[in-house]
């Protein structure tokens, strides 16, 4: 759409024009009121899942269930706990992460403990996956099943945190999980009449640096976990993070993936 309108600036102008048109003619019949956060902190917490807010002494807790699918039991525990805490709420991100916000250090620790067994333990487990063909009527492949099998294989192989990126997986060309705009993504496909996944590499969604990833090749579903484990070991041997390694080895991922295509 940006290209059709003449670039990002023209797209922005068109959006602002439509926004002004709507704001000038429609009565939304509601008013959004900004609620001030007045609660005070009760200490300091240092945890990779705790993020300090701009309000002194308050924190947000990162909660990322694998594939964005929380345990119903944990979900209910979190919901019940939220009712008892002043100003606390959940905010959802586009990558299937939930942020439990407006917490004191003590409250943050409570939610960290509550969700400890139902949240990503590594960068790789921060992966995103669409709901997949097991539920979606348009889905070609089961994204959630692939992510679970990959996470289990990576964990079993002892791949260190940071050696693999947070992949995005979509079961069909609809690409709900945006596999084309991240360092590594997969999209449902077919190979030799078998379930398979198209590998995307080097995508980016950062403003001003937007680019669709390269379609590197198609890998059989049964071999995707093996590919990721081999890649993770290769990166780990270098002592670098995946981001550092891929920058230093522009075609490194494709070399590892070549035998799986």
Across the structure, where does each feature detected by a protein language model lie?
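Peripheral terminal and linker regions in Fe-S/redox and tRNA-modifying enzymes
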Residues: 1-261
């Amino acid at each position: 759409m940006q290209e059709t309108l003449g670039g990002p600036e023209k797209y922005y102008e068109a959006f602002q024009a439509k926004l002004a048109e709507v704001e000038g003619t429609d009565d939304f019949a509601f008013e959004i009121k900004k609620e001030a956060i007045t609660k005070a902190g009760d200490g300091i917490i240092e945890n990779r899942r705790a993020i300090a807010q701009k309000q002194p002494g308050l924190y947000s807790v990162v909660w990322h269930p694998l594939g964005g699918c929380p345990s119903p039991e944990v979900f209910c525990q979190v919901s019940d706990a939220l009712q008892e805490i002043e100003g606390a709420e959940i905010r959802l991100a586009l990558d299937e992460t939930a942020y439990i916000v407006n917490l004191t250090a003590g409250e943050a620790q409570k939610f960290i403990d509550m969700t400890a067994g139902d949240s990503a333990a590594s960068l790789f487990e921060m992966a995103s996956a669409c709901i997949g063909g097991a539920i979606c009527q348009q889905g070609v492949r089961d994204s959630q099943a692939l992510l679970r099998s990959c996470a289990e294989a990576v964990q079993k192989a002892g791949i260190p945190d940071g050696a693999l990126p947070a992949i995005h997986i979509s079961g069909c060309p609809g690409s709900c999980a945006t596999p084309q705009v991240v360092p590594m993504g997969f999209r449902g496909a077919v190979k030799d009449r078998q379930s398979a996944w198209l590998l995307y590499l080097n995508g980016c969604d950062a403003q001003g640096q937007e680019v669709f990833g390269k379609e590197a090749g198609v890998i059989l579903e049964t071999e995707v976990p093996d590919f990721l484990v081999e890649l993770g070991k290769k990166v780990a041997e270098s002592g670098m993070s995946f981001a550092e390694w891929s920058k230093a080895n522009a075609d490194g991922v494709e070399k590892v993936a070549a035998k799986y295509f």
